[in-house]
Amino acid sequence: MINIFYNEWRGLFRNKLFIFFSLFFGILLIIATFFGIIQNKKQIQSQKDAHKHIRQQWDEMDAANPHSAAHFGTYAFKPSSILNSLDEGVNSVTGVVLRLESHKQNEIAFSEASQSLIISKFGKFKASLLFQFIIPLFLIFLSFNTYTSEISTGRLKLLIIQGNSLRKIVFAKIFSLLSLAAILLLLATLILVFFNFKQIE
């Protein structure tokens, strides 16, 4: 099975189209992760600035009874982590700011999706978009190509005649494609850790 896995990778590296798309998705992943990190850092900073401003407003408020102070209200921000650089989840749709005031139950407001163009509501260009839609599609086409090439060249029959079971052959091929996805995921993780090393510490 290890030999099949090794030969599968050798066959993939002989394919110029595979090398081109692997490099293309690798570069695209680096760009998406890098810009996701920049955007996340800006969002964290803007939340800190807003929190500081709200606290300053609260401290500078004139003397009043507690009930009036409760009606003045304040804002709560949903905390942002470094993983938001890869995937925001529902934050861009639901929002990250909640107004707190007495006698009222407000919903989370100021979502980016409500203030953006219709086309951008389908999702931002982030690493999660590549991992959820584009890279799996690439792996499906790649797996179909390897399967059809094995049948057309007669290599599949040759491998079975040599004593390899069909289950082992299929498993080795699946494992080789999953290892490619794991390499791309590792690349995104390394970029994320490298640019957020101080924040992780």
Named regions from a protein language model:
Residues 1-25:
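Aromatic- and glycine-rich beta-strand/loop motifs that create alpha-glucan
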Residues 3, 144-179:
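Helix-loop-helix units of permease transmembrane domains in multi-pass membrane transporters
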Residues 24-26, 31, 45, 49:
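N-terminal low-complexity, Ser/Thr- and acidic-residue-enriched intrinsically disordered segments
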Residues 29-36, 58-59, 96-138, 172-201:
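Secretory targeting signals
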Residues 38-42, 46, 150, 194-199:
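Membrane-interface elements of multi-pass transporters and channels
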Residues 40-106:
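Membrane-proximal extracellular/periplasmic loop immediately following the first transmembrane helix
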Residues 66-82, 116-129, 155-164, 189-193:
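Hydrophobic alpha-helical transmembrane segments
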Residues 75-89, 123-149, 153:
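Long, hydrophobic alpha-helical segments
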